[in-house]
């Protein structure tokens, strides 16, 4: 079975413009670029896909939902959720309120839950069960102290799971991978990326921000950090078996 993790940066591509690169790139149209991302995903032939930073219908996409488009392009079931809770002040802003994360699967998504952590701006956790495995898709805060609080709460979610499990996403471990090691030890999780290949930025990878962690009843057969410039992050593709 194959699982692909990819922070797609709302389909706006990597930083292409030197001046005001972050703002102009963030606001860029993404309708054409999302087609390239869909074709890339299709070529990898994953069974399950975890997508971080998905545009769910802002002006960048002319109100079209990237999760729906990618599910159609890859012929998969899908589930998505907005990053911010309904009563959050961030939901008042036109672009921000259409930002979210999504999961695609070639099999039925039999259960799903949306968890919002207590701290931070980035605090959505999507939990699904599909293909005999439970997936937790995360995108953690940029602030280190906030991340530490989020790790504690994330652990309280995963410790209740007694099924084969993958915890994957953009953990934003800007302080280094050491900050995730205590969480992994407490949760009895291993990283699929044993060589600690960096995933950010895509054009000159220096930091390992994206992780695919797994429980002991999952055996990793192969892992690839794929070099592609479709986003500012590199995708991770794993081949695994449930044992």
Task: Specify the residue positions occupied by each region the protein language model found.
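Structured beta-strand-rich core segments of catalytic domains in phosphoester-bond hydrolases
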Residues: 53-132, 224-227
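Active-site environment of divalent metal-dependent phosphoester hydrolases
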Residues: 11-12, 56-59, 86-88, 143-146, ...
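Metal-dependent phosphoester/phosphodiester hydrolase catalytic core
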Residues: 128-133, 138-145
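Active-site beta-strand/loop signature of hydrolases that rely on acidic residues for catalysis
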Residues: 2-7, 36-61, 135-138, 154-181, ...
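Residue-level detector of structured alpha->beta connecting loops
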Residues: 45, 75, 106-108, 162, ...
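N-terminal, active-site-proximal structural segment of metallo-dependent hydrolase catalytic domains
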Residues: 1-73, 80-83, 88, 243
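Charged helix-capping and loop-helix junction motifs
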Residues: 63-68, 149-155
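Metal-dependent phosphoester-hydrolase catalytic domains
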Residues: 114, 129, 156-166, 171-243
């Amino acid at each position: 079975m194959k699982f692909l993790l990819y922070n797609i940066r709302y389909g706006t591509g990597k930083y292409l413009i030197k001046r005001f690169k972050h703002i102009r790139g963030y606001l860029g149209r993404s309708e054409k670029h999302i087609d390239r991302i869909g074709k890339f995903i299709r070529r990898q032939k994953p069974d399950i896909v975890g997508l971080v930073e998905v545009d769910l219908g802002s002006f960048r996409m002319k109100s079209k939902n990237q999760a729906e488009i990618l599910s159609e392009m890859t012929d998969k079931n899908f589930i998505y959720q907005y990053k911010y809770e309904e009563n959050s002040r961030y939901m008042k802003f036109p672009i921000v309120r259409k930002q979210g994360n999504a999961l695609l699967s070639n099999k039925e998504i039999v259960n799903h839950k949306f968890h919002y952590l207590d701290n931070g701006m980035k605090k959505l956790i999507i939990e699904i069960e599909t293909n005999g495995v439970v997936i937790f898709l995360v995108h953690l805060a940029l602030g280190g102290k906030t991340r530490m609080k989020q790790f504690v709460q994330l652990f309280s979610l995963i410790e209740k799971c007694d099924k084969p499990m993958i915890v994957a996403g953009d953990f934003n471990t800007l302080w280094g991978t050491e900050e995730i090691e205590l969480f992994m030890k407490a949760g009895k999780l291993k990283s699929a990326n044993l060589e600690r290949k960096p995933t950010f930025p895509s054009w000159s990878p220096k930091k390992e921000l994206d992780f695919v962690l797994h429980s002991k009843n999952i055996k990793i057969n192969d892992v690839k950090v794929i070099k592609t410039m479709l986003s500012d992050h590199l995708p991770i593709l794993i081949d695994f078996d449930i044992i």
